[in-house]
């Protein structure tokens, strides 16, 4: 009789990738009661906020599913927190964890109760393929962004390695690129920032190249959302099998993992939303790393005041210059906002710090979402049927903005090519236009399409749905 399979999941450091990884861990063990998961937790100091509490909340769970998910904390490492050092050393940090990963997995391989079936490594942890190879087990990649982005990265890597084409040549270019995973020509100005700088493009394309060594790629998406991109990927014989298994979202966050102050803030926010009419509130939130300088904050404030719509604005203080840290809450918003703004808008708006994003998007009073277009936020807004006005900041968010606006007609645009720390301000006029557009979609096809895509995303996870079936194929593979 064959032993139950044990998969080792290795997420990148930081809460963002960890949440998606644990969602797929829960999904896997819920589908197969003979499957066990071990999650290896790396502690990179600059991005470790919230990780310990989140893991502990799951480890403390008494559900049968959680009992088959084991966590191993790898040794802590002290590192410099300056911006340059973190950017340059994250890859090196992950590489340095290889011996710790090998040690942690040694006991699993020798287990008399389970069979080590393979590694599922985060998109930034492909160096752990080396460890899997040493142990003689297969590797898979978990890609936390969308299929169109995955296709773009494979395309850029192929251009470099087969045609000697340097993607950094597209920096400041007005060119439009033909990418198989995108239906429309892609403006070079929405390429991920790291693809436009040699120091970051080269190592990142090397990471993507290693995807080709694996036995499969799990992607947090679903067929109805990205059918064109998924078809393009499956048509390329040089790319491993792609398994769309999303949308993977943490919709039932455990209140025990947040402190009592955050619970109080959440209750206060939801109470305020309870008093607003249906679909009347525009929600502005820019992710765990999103913040603006004071001049841009004033442009947003002026736009909100002139637009006249009810609003809930998550406004956070930028970290000190030169340091990599999460934005923090202001002690007092009055110093950064235009004089008298809070008094003039007190009847229609609420300015907050930290926001319980999923709970807010789920609230019936919310009718629009001004978002940085992180992939998780994009999926969350679709799940809850809330149209987005796009304002990307960093990473692949410009792609995530282009796709729903131009490819799928599921969003409106404030700015698709804006980048964090850009010297160019997005004007109050542009922001106001985007707010009005996203909030006045009552008779628009966009709101209707968003609602339809919401239903398709939910059906994808149901028995017989596209993602349900795809996950089953992956389980059969292991």
UniProtKB/Swiss-Prot annotation:
Annotated TM spans: none
A matching Pfam family: UDPGT
A GO term, aspect molecular function: UDP-glucosyltransferase activity
Keyword annotations: Glycosyltransferase, Transferase
Entry-linked InterPro entries: UDP-glycosyltransf_plant (IPR050481), UDP_glucos_trans (IPR002213), UDP_glycos_trans_CS (IPR035595)
Record's keyword annotation contains Glycosyltransferase: yes
Keyword Cell membrane (UniProt): no
Catalytic activity, EC: 2.4.1.-
Highest taxon of source: Eukaryota
Family the entry assigns: Belongs to the UDP-glycosyltransferase family.
The protein's name in its UniProt record: Putative UDP-glucose flavonoid 3-O-glucosyltransferase 3
Protein species of origin: Fragaria ananassa (Strawberry)
Higher taxonomy: Eukaryota, Viridiplantae, Streptophyta, Embryophyta, Tracheophyta
